């Protein structure tokens, strides 16, 4: 079974630099390399009857699905695992973030065993059928109530106005809250939602969730509801695996926060001291505790300190996306799926338009085996070479990333101006052409970087003996 542990970042439209809603997640796996691909699922290719590979759970799907983008596993042996996308109504979804639970709720509504739905399924069963972020929450809530789940998961939905974050609770329950427009969220692999208001329209939950809390005396707080306290965890593992990631992101946006990496009650809803850009998210998704003793590539800490906390940028990043719904362009241009394959510390993210019917071959045709024509496999090769001597290769990678992202920005700016009056198939053709241009320049720059790394590394091999003549 595929292992998936991720990091999610959400940014409201008034907190972002350009007024976009932004939902981002790194899809991280385990020891096995899980090749990823980028595809468009057309309505005629969406199944009408769905069957999960992992559990065999069968679901009859509604008619008239929407077109949507998807980042499925290339080999499919564990199922689709569509991960994230934006549909033709400019509604985005990312699923899922593996989260934690506790024995109290598991004794009431246990996770299913060998049945129900999970990360493999949720995007495929939800994204083609929703027309707003709120609809996404309600759709998943209905699926959980009917089919249940075998794992604890968090997921996010966005449209041009709203972002919602949902967490599953036990086998059939859930809770969700709308992210304030002027706030951001970082969600590591634990149950993250804290303060919860059952009376507010900015919160949604299973119909009987509040009753369960009361009937089983689950609330440890004297006032209000904190779902992390009620349904979540506060373990030693959280203090080194989860909490430090939230701490690093929150201190990046506000260095004056009075928290430590070990704190169990780091806030869910946070306000930055400046507007947040896509570039900020890219940096954080690639971060490894730079300028702290906990940076594995740094020179501040001891060997023990460098291995103490789990970073966001890690060898197990297999794909990372930032789903951007823009508010300053026509609807046909609004959806942008920033996408990077492989460890984020060594890749460059590409801003693909999502109003398309196909994707560039270098991102689409990954294949399950090593393939030098696939950007996924090139990025894996580059990251494993770069990891051998980060001090030597790190600046080369930074220059590559800036060069590539800047070139993609130029293509995006030019395309936005050129297609303002276009619609339908003509617009899609121009956006597809722009996507291909960005994919091609990213591929070429990646190959160029690999060449520079080989040239630079030649004289630094351990297998050497200096000439004496």
Predicted regions and their residues:
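Ordered core of a single globular domain
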Residues: 191-340
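Substrate-recognition/cap regions that form aromatic- and gly/pro-loop-enriched pockets
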Residues: 294-422
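Histidine-centered catalytic/metal-binding microenvironments
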Residues: 400-469
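Short, charged, surface-exposed loops that flank catalytic or proteolytic processing sites
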Residues: 129-135
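C-terminal/peripheral segments of proteins
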Residues: 18, 29-32, 41-48, 58-60, ...
């Amino acid at each position: 079974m595929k292992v998936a542990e991720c990091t999610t970042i959400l940014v409201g439209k008034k907190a972002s630099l350009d007024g976009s809603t932004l939902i981002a997640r790194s899809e991280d796996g385990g020891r096995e390399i899980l090749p990823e691909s980028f595809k468009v699922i057309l309505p005629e290719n969406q199944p009408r009857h769905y069957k999960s590979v992992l559990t065999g759970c069968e679901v009859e799907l509604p008619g008239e699905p929407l077109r949507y983008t998807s980042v499925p596993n290339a080999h499919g042996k564990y199922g689709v695992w569509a991960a994230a996308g934006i549909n033709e109504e400019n509604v985005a979804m990312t699923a899922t973030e593996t989260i934690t639970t506790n024995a109290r709720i598991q004794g009431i509504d246990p996770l299913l065993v060998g049945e129900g739905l999970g990360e493999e399924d949720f995007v495929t069963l939800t994204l083609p059928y929703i027309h707003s972020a709120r609809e996404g929450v309600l759709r998943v809530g209905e699926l959980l109530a009917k089919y249940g789940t075998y794992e604890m998961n968090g997921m996010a939905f966005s449209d041009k106005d709203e972002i919602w974050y949902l967490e599953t609770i036990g086998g059939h329950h859930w809770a969700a809250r709308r992210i304030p427009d002027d706030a951001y969220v970082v969600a590591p692999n634990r149950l993250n939602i804290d303060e919860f208001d059952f009376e507010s329209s900015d919160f949604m939950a299973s119909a009987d969730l509040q009753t369960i809390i009361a009937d089983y005396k689950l609330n440890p707080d004297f006032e209000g509801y904190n779902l992390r306290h009620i349904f979540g965890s506060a373990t030693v593992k959280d203090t080194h695996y989860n909490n430090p990631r939230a701490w690093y992101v929150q201190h990046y946006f506000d260095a004056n926060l009075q928290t430590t990496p070990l704190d169990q009650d780091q806030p869910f809803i946070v306000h930055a001291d400046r507007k947040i850009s896509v570039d900020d998210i890219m940096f954080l998704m690639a971060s490894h505790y730079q300028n702290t003793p906990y940076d594995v590539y740094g020179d501040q800490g001891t060997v023990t300190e460098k291995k103490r906390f789990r970073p966001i940028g890690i060898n197990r990043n297999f794909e990372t996306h930032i789903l951007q719904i823009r508010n300053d362009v026509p609807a046909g241009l609004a959806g942008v799926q920033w996408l990077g394959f492989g460890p984020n510390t060594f890749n460059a993210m590409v801003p693909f338009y999502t109003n398309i019917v196909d994707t560039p071959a270098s991102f689409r045709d990954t294949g399950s085996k090593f393939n030098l024509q696939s950007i996924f496999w090139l990025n894996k090769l580059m990251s494993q070479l770069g990891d051998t001597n980060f001090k030597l290769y790190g600046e080369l990678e930074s220059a590559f990333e800036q060069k590539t992202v800047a070139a993609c920005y130029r293509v995006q700016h030019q395309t936005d101006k050129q297609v303002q009056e276009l619609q339908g198939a003509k617009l899609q053709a121009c956006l597809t052409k722009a996507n291909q241009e960005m994919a091609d320049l990213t591929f070429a720059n990646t190959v160029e970087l690999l060449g520079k790394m080989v040239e630079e590394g030649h004289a630094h091999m351990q297998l050497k003996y200096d000439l004496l003549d």
